[in-house]
Amino acid sequence: MTSAAPPAPGNLPAEPNSFIGRERDLSELALLLSDVRALTLCGPGGIGKTRLAVRLACDLVPEFPDGAWLVELADTANADLLPRRVAATFGIREEQDRPLIATLAEALRGRRLLLVLDTCEHIVDGCAELVQQLLASCPSLRVIATSREPLRVRGETVWRVP
């Protein structure tokens, strides 16, 4: 008797109902994310960026043994709190006399994981800085961001959600 592999770590919400009408987008985005490390889903509010990002992440969980992780940023008004929000998602604690981004990058380095940053537009510069630093330090990291505008980080691919 063989046992099933344990589920990958992560914090993605369960899909509450079926996902209809974006199958082609999901296929194209999954293929795209195999080649790029930063993907931003852009479009106006309410168009379905978050739902598409979460579904894509759920579909890609088998590709990321260290999990797929969602950080919801809608209620993060201050970009200076962004590293703390991301660190808390992973259970990473701040170290005295060390920038939190350095602690975060060290903890994630060598891990193959997918990070979904949701609702970045109101702190887009802070998100861009964080993503740029994490991608530079964590070669196996992939990032999906949702925003009304691109992050404008090096290597970012922008997908306009119709």
Regions of interest found by a model, annotated:
Residues 4-7, 21, 40, 74-78, ...:
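A generic short alpha-helical patch detector that favors 3-5-residue windows
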Residues 18, 24-47, 51-112:
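Post-nucleotide-binding-loop coupling segment downstream of the phosphate-binding loop, primarily
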Residues 1-31:
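Conserved adenine-nucleotide phosphate-binding loops and their immediately adjacent elements
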Residues 4-8, 79-83, 107-110, 124-128:
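Generic detector of short, locally flexible boundary/turn motifs and exposed helical patches
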Residues 30-35, 52, 57-65, 98-162:
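A conserved switch/coupling segment of P-loop NTPase cores
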Residues 13, 20, 42, 71-72, ...:
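Residue-level detector of conserved, well-ordered beta-strand and adjacent loop positions
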Residues 7, 14-15, 47, 148, ...:
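Residue-level signal for pocket-adjacent positions within structured domains
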